[in-house]
């Protein structure tokens, strides 16, 4: 039996008719009875939609009260983002490797259920709002331990390579990430080519971004590493992980994950655009780089190339600027009218200033330590 009596719902498509999803979930869980207590659209997620489902399940594989999240596509998406089926596989691989992520439960490819693919994962406790996190009263005491934990989590993630096989129940070893594209040469040169193509597709002139890409290309011998790629989140930053009592409970939003140089994730996490005004704490505005580096190197058994991180920070500013322009284009084209998306384009000058300042610091030889 399925019931939605008493559900706390808003006026949105899923909340207006959750019956097909609940029927599908009852089949997946083998439940005798599944009652929806609450449906709530979660904030954030400019590229995907996330819905909190509070369920009471009787019988089957998940008997009892459950808090799950349904994740599906927004009205339009950034072209380079992974599909929901691919993101589910990525989340499953990370979970099996012991990365701190929500447990992925079920994937639905039947468009008759919701109109588009979606997956279900466990809801995790914690706060993700970046500006609240970087201004937390407990940050001075908890920041060092928190960024050390982030270093351990990232090292665990980067232990996944294209050769990694995952042990799954009843299936033996399985290669879950077969779908991820591989690149020739270095991740750095591959990223430059991707950003150039993205700018060309926008059809508007952005000379600062073009200059910065040229500068990165001119300096490839310094920061490009053709070493074996690792699985990188590629959006590992404050705002994409949940924090509860000073500890990370889950790394979220895997739509950009793929093979890359592990320094890309570190440059992204430490980029100025993701410090949210907390400039003196380079690791996402939360803590020092030295604490992060010590934990990462201890957990991974690999030393970091700190010089390369500066160049990856420039790339991070470029990439976020391109994504912001793409998001603004989604609004401007009429695909998805949203004030948040429209305002994204106005963030680009700040990123351009960040990349120019960083290039200047590197060229003058005064960029040497992220904590300085």
Residue ranges and their predicted role:
Residues 263-301, 315-334:
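Active-site activation/catalytic loop segments of kinase-like enzymes and analogous catalytic loops
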Residues 2-32:
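Juxta-kinase regulatory segment immediately upstream of eukaryotic protein kinase catalytic domains
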Residues 252-257:
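Activation of the activation-loop gatekeeper triad in protein kinase-fold domains
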Residues 231-233, 238:
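Catalytic-loop of the protein kinase fold
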Residues 303-315:
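All-alpha amphipathic helical-bundle segments outside canonical DNA-binding/catalytic cores
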Residues 229-231, 249:
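Conserved protein kinase catalytic-loop anchor
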Residues 40-211, 215, 219-228:
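ATP-binding pocket architecture of kinase catalytic cores
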